[in-house]
Amino acid sequence: MSIKTEEISSLIKKQLANYQDKVSVEETGTVTYVGDGVARADGLDNAMAGELLEFSNGVYGMAQNLESNDVGIVILGDYTGIREGDTVKRTGRIMEVPVGDALLGRVVDSLGRPIDGLGEIKTDKTRPIERKAPGVMERKSVSVPLQTGIKVIDALVPIGRGQRELIIGDRKTGKTAIALDTIINQKNQDVICIYVAIGQKESTVRASVETLRKYGALDYTIVVSASASNPAPMLYIAPYAGAAMGEEFMFNGKDVLIVYDDLSKQADAYRELSLILRRPPGREAYPGDIFYTHSRLLERAARLSDDLGGGSMTALPIIQTQAGDVSAYIPTNVISITDGQIFLDSDEFYAGQRPAIDAGTSVSRVGGDAQIKAMKKVAGTLRLDIASYNELASFAQFGSDLDAATQAKLARGQRTMEVLKQGLHDPLPVEEQVVTLFALSRGFIDKVEIEDVQRYESELAAYMHANHQDLYDTIKKTGKLPEGDDLQNAVAKFSETFQGTKKQVAEEK
């Protein structure tokens, strides 16, 4: 077959037209060790701390240890397919996760990938998981309440938007229940919620998701799950990923509530990583920067200044104690970082006082400024009343011949503790809480038998809704008690008509 001369020149011209002189340069290294969720690689001399690195099988890792002869990498995924001698290349990017409205109602892993079987998440927005916390001048003081719907918290340890309030207690004392109830109570409050489950059983996470779905809270909630079966690096980065998702809303002027459940397991995962990376162990074998690990996370919760949109991110970190020991290393660290703590006591829990919040050791350091005036007025002496009741109750065990004043105090204390009990996933609007505590503080509940207190409370709420909705509306809109004696008269009128169980039984006979 002969080719004409003019065809040869046109073929050469075509080839030259397709020629590109751009050369893609990739900096690659070689894996020298892999195991337990960690790899080491040499040849990555210019890698940055926290940079995303890609292994030859498509799994990503994050540069953690930058040493003179190699780089320590935490592997973000299944490490069983990575072998010594594999190549690993730099991406030039730091670790990012997808953010935005598309994540609402979804369950994702630590990398923002969906794990709920509802298809891919369509968003083109991403944010780095590590970000410097807002500075002093970028913040505003906490002054807007975040209602949890739980009487004992809203009355004694009020939380404000932009606050960090620690929930601490032994296992199985109701820590997660308080966090979920708070999320459920944000319905119609224009608050975006993020629930970060760290190191939990997948069945437990599933139950939490179904609870949120049942009460209609999943529509405004993102669930980030790094379950116990995930490698340690996924547990370590999960809270930072959740914080990045929350910051997207916060910097767009919205209010965010984020729950870290729990940071004890994240600390354990970070300890595991650090020991495998051969970092020097410190107290309880935790690395020296374990305090910084938690402080840089929790400092990202803030109420932003008006110049930055006035958004907020409220953090509820959870810490699990052992045998009620709040003086251990991680609990004391997180207590010192946060703006207060809600301490759950296992003895109270098993005695039937639920939520089992210890009023003596629980405190809110900045939330008092955010508490509405009506609640301040009716709950002013509540903490003191509980403290004196606990003291009298332990003293009364030794003798029965108590004077009338002491007996009256004991009776009021018993009714106070009964009022502060609350059912699971049953948060109350703040106006109902205020009226109940008003009835308690004005002595209307003193005449009610202890077994009838909770029925009195629910019937009072129903009576007020039916006959005095305007009083509820006043409390809700103004944050203050209604002027005059209207509320006093309404509660007094209901109390006259309320019939205790004993009276009902006597009448039936």
Swiss-Prot record:
So where does ATP get bound? Answer: G169, D170, R171, K172, T173, G174, K175, T176
User: What does the record give as EC number?
Assistant: 7.1.2.2
List the catalysed reactions: ATP + H2O + 4 H(+)(in) = ADP + phosphate + 5 H(+)(out)
One Pfam family matching this protein: ATP-synt_ab_N
Q: Which InterPro entries match?
A: ATP_synth_asu-like_sf (IPR023366), ATP_synth_asu_C (IPR000793), ATP_synth_asu_C_sf (IPR038376), ATP_synth_F1_a_nt-bd_dom (IPR033732), ATP_synth_F1_asu (IPR005294), ATPase_a/bsu_AS (IPR020003), ATPase_F1/V1/A1_a/bsu_N (IPR004100), ATPase_F1/V1/A1_a/bsu_N_sf (IPR036121)
The superkingdom listed in its UniProt entry is Bacteria
Annotated Gene Ontology cellular components are: plasma membrane; proton-transporting ATP synthase complex
Keyword line:
ATP synthesis, ATP-binding, Cell membrane, CF(1), Hydrogen ion transport, Ion transport, Membrane, Nucleotide-binding, Translocase, Transport
In this chain, the site described as Required for activity is at S362
Main localisation? membrane
What are the subcellular locations of this protein?
Answer: Cell membrane
Q: Known PROSITE patterns for this protein?
A: ATPASE_ALPHA_BETA (PS00152)
Membrane disposition: Peripheral membrane protein
Annotated GO molecular function terms are: ADP binding; ATP binding; proton-transporting ATP synthase activity, rotational mechanism
Subunit structure as annotated in this protein's UniProt entry: F-type ATPases have 2 components, CF(1) - the catalytic core - and CF(0) - the membrane proton channel. CF(1) has five subunits: alpha(3), beta(3), gamma(1), delta(1), epsilon(1). CF(0) has three main subunits: a(1), b(2) and c(9-12). The alpha and beta chains form an alternating ring which encloses part of the gamma chain. CF(1) is attached to CF(0) by a central stalk formed by the gamma and epsilon chains, while a peripheral stalk is formed by the delta and b chains.
Can you tell me which family this protein belongs to? Belongs to the ATPase alpha/beta chains family.
What NCBIfam families has UniProt attached to this entry? atpA (TIGR00962), PRK13343.1 (NF009884)
PANTHER family reported for this sequence? ATP SYNTHASE SUBUNIT ALPHA, MITOCHONDRIAL
Describe the function of this protein: Produces ATP from ADP in the presence of a proton gradient across the membrane. The alpha chain is a regulatory subunit.
According to UniProt, the name of this protein is ATP synthase subunit alpha
> From what organism does this protein derive?
Limosilactobacillus reuteri (strain DSM 20016) (Lactobacillus reuteri)
Q: Which gene encodes it?
A: atpA
